[in-house]
């Protein structure tokens, strides 16, 4: 099969289909199809989950970021380092399945996670759940229409390190 974007047109839909391939919107078909897909993804979570870590070893704070927020996070991290904070970065390349295992491991070694998001808290809830009280999960929200100010992220990182 060609990959999406490789020059071929194909129809993609959110419909569920029965075992014959025909669209079916019954509760039973929905449950069967969605459960199969979710279990398939969860079963391969270790091979699907992708993230890039930088300087997390020995860090007091880890910034967990994704998407465009990662670029601004990098600037905030640099500012915090200039103030003497030991801060690492975990940039999520794949958001789901979530990097639960690694967040759990890091939560036992760091004081806090700082999570900048251009919303009012989605991924921070996953970080908080996985940290399970071992480390704080601090949201740095942004309403949109732009990106975070690196100084605001620096302030959050410095505060989390105390």
Describe the residue ranges of each PLM region.
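Flexible, low-complexity linker and terminal segments
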Residues: 1-162
């Amino acid at each position: 099969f060609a990959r999406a974007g490789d020059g071929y047109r194909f129809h993609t839909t959110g419909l569920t289909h029965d075992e014959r391939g025909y669209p079916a919107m019954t509760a039973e078909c929905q449950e069967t199809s969605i459960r199969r897909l979710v279990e398939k993804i969860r079963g391969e979570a270790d091979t699907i989950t992708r993230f890039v870590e930088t300087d997390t070893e020995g860090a007091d704070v880890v910034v967990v970021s994704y998407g465009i927020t990662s670029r601004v996070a990098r600037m905030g991290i640099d500012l915090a380092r200039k103030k003497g904070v030991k801060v690492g970065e975990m940039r999520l390349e794949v958001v789901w399945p979530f990097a639960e295992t690694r967040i759990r491991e890091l939560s036992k070694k760091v004081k806090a996670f700082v999570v900048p998001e251009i919303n009012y808290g989605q991924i921070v809830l996953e970080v908080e759940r996985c940290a399970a009280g071992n480390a704080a999960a601090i949201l740095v929200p942004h309403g949109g229409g732009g990106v975070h100010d690196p100084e605001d992220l620096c302030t959050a990182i410095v505060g989390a390190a105390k």
